[in-house]
Structure formats: structure tokens, C-alpha cells
């Protein structure tokens, strides 16, 4: 029995090294076999499925393995077997105690940089352009409770808006539930180990994502800002005729803003929600106030967010 366990342990250690031997080309060869099998199985039960192939989303770095550096060499072998491309990105510098400005700047700039790199990679390889699914995104920033903060909520809205603007087919935040780890926690909800916070309590990012989606129209439309580097605007229109604008203040101070509309008729009334952090934990408040309403706990947001009336 002891010898059996040792053999299993040795086998597992060998398995740990497998990614070093996998190449992009071999992945593509396996991928095509997998797609054929899955498509055949789906057809047999009268279903249509869509399968994505994984790309490396950014230029190679010196510290990366040769597998990662050469991964996108899979494209010629892949051909046209896939329905979309899959990428992941955690935006900020790995394992760094990033400040709020660094976190927000990453959300503001990385989606466009990443899309440019992907499209150039496809063009260079002569590969077909297909939808890009950002199936995992979040931040590496840690050490100051960045991941569970109000700033993480602003980061989330920026990532989603930039994903829309840069025509990603999908942008899925990682993840719903994780582990507290003193605030280095990607979870959208508390896992129950956060002191004084019950399991499934929404984090600030949840509220930002909820209200961004609630107010978002059917079509993304152009928006620009003059005389301010602090405000980032995103606008959308509804098929019913109304329009929406999301204004993100990236500075530490309040900013007075005037909104002007082009090519749209202005209605008689407008409605809005205002989200902001509280005065706890410096740049990374664990609380979010929505139209002045906040949590009764040490973290999170207002319990009645779904029935909270807008300002008007």
C-alpha cells in the first residue's frame, strides 16, 4: 500500500510538468479532434454548440515558458475549426499592491491594447477573425483589499464598457465566490469567512455591475468629454428612444459636469443613480453608497438596492 501511494505521488509530479511539453500546434491538433467529436455528439441529439480556442492575449515576456511564448503558433494548424477565441486577463501588475490610479488606468487601457494585439496576431498568422470571448477578467492587485473595494466596482464598469467599445463578444468577471484571504478575494460575493459579513453578501462590484446593466440601452453610441481628464463617459440608446450616459469620475474629487446631446431629442426629465465609496480603508473602501444609501454592515452596499428609487 505504501509503494502504491508513492507511485501515485510520483505520477502526479510528472503530470505537473506536462504543460512544459504541450505546444500550440499540438493543442490545435487535439482541439480539432475534440471539436469533431463534440459536434458529432451535439448533432446526434439535435443541438448546436459553439466551441472556442484559447489564445495568449498579450506579447510574450522573458519569464514565461516557451510553451506560452509560442502558443499562438497554433493558429495555422487550427484552421477554421473554432467558433470563437478565448482569452483571459487580470489587467494589473501581478502580485503588486497597486494604488487606485493604477487599477483604474489598467481597466481603461488594457482592453483596447489587448484587442489590438489579438487582431494583429490573427492578421500575421492569416487566421480568420472571429468573436473574442474574454472569459475571465479581474485584477492581480492585492495587499490593500483592492479586489473587494469600491474601486473594484469602478474597475468593473470600465472593463465592461471598454469590452463593449472594443467589440468583445463576451466579458465574464471571475468569479462569484472565492476565499476571503484578508481581502485578496476575487469573489463578487462574500464566502462567509470575511469577519462580520454573512455568506453571499454582495461586494461593491456587484452594485456597480447591476446598475450599469440596469441603465444600459440597446445600442452603444459615441460619447466624448471636453476640458476634463477625470471623467470617462459611455453612452447608449434604447430602441424606445431614450438615451443613457454613464459618467465615471476617476479622480479623488467631485467634478461638475454638463451633458450635451447631439442627434437626440432631450426629454422633460432624467433619472440617475450615483455610486461612491465611503470613508473607510483609504482609496479602497469596502462599502458602496447608492444615492446615499449604504450597508448596515462593515462592507457591501444597500440591502434594498433593487427597489431603490432613482434621483430625478
Regions found by a protein language model. Give the residues of each.
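Short conserved micro-motifs at the rims of enzyme active sites and ligand-binding pockets
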Residues: 145, 256-259, 282-289
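Aromatic/acidic polysaccharide-binding cleft in carbohydrate-active enzymes
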Residues: 134-241
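Carbohydrate-binding surface patches
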Residues: 228-268, 272-279, 312
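Acidic, Ser/Thr/Pro-rich beta/coil linker or hinge segments at domain junctions
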Residues: 264-311
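Active-site-proximal beta-strand/loop segments in catalytic clefts of secreted hydrolases
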Residues: 1, 54-58, 87-91, 135-138, ...
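Noncatalytic carbohydrate-binding groove/subsite architecture in carbohydrate-active enzymes
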Residues: 7, 12, 20-159, 166
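Generic recognition of flexible, low-complexity loop/linker segments
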Residues: 72-74, 120-122, 158-161, 170, ...
Amino acid at each position: 500500500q505504501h509503494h502504491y501511494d508513492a507511485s501515485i505521488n510520483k505520477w502526479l509530479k510528472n503530470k505537473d510538468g506536462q504543460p512544459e511539453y504541450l505546444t500550440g500546434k499540438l493543442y490545435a491538433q487535439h482541439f480539432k479532434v475534440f471539436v469533431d467529436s463534440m459536434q458529432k455528439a451535439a448533432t446526434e441529439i439535435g443541438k448546436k454548440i459553439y466551441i472556442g480556442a484559447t489564445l495568449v492575449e498579450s506579447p510574450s515576456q522573458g519569464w514565461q515558458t516557451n510553451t506560452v511564448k509560442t502558443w499562438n503558433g497554433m493558429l495555422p494548424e487550427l484552421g477554421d475549426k473554432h467558433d470563437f477565441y478565448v482569452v483571459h486577463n487580470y489587467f494589473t501588475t501581478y502580485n503588486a499592491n497597486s494604488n487606485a490610479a493604477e487599477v483604474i488606468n489598467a481597466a481603461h487601457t488594457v482592453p483596447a491594447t489587448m484587442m489590438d494585439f489579438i487582431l494583429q496576431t490573427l492578421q500575421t498568422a492569416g487566421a480568420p477573425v472571429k468573436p473574442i470571448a474574454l472569459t475571465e477578467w479581474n485584477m492581480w492587485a492585492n495587499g490593500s483589499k483592492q479586489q473587494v473595494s469600491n474601486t473594484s466596482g469602478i474597475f468593473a464598469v470600465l472593463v465592461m464598457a471598454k469590452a463593449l467599445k472594443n467589440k468583445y463578444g463576451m466579458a465574464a468577471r471571475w468569479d462569484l465566490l472565492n476565499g476571503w484571504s484578508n481581502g485578496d478575494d476575487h469573489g463578487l460575493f462574500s464566502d462567509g469567512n470575511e469577519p462580520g459579513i454573512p455568506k453571499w453578501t454582495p461586494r461593491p462590484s456587484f452594485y456597480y455591475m447591476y446598475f450599469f446593466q440596469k441603465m444600459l440601452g440597446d445600442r452603444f453610441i459615441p460619447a466624448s468629454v471636453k476640458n476634463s481628464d477625470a471623467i470617462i463617459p459611455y453612452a447608449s440608446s434604447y430602441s424606445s428612444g431614450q438615451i443613457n450616459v454613464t459618467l465615471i469620475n476617476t479622480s479623488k474629487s467631485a467634478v461638475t459636469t454638463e451633458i450635451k446631446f447631439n442627434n437626440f431629442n432631450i426629454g422633460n426629465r432624467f433619472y440617475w443613480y450615483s455610486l461612491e465609496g465611503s470613508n473607510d480603508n483609504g482609496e479602497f473602501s469596502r462599502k458602496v453608497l447608492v444615492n446615499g444609501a449604504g450597508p448596515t454592515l462593515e462592507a457591501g452596499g444597500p440591502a434594498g438596492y433593487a427597489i431603490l428609487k432613482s434621483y430625478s
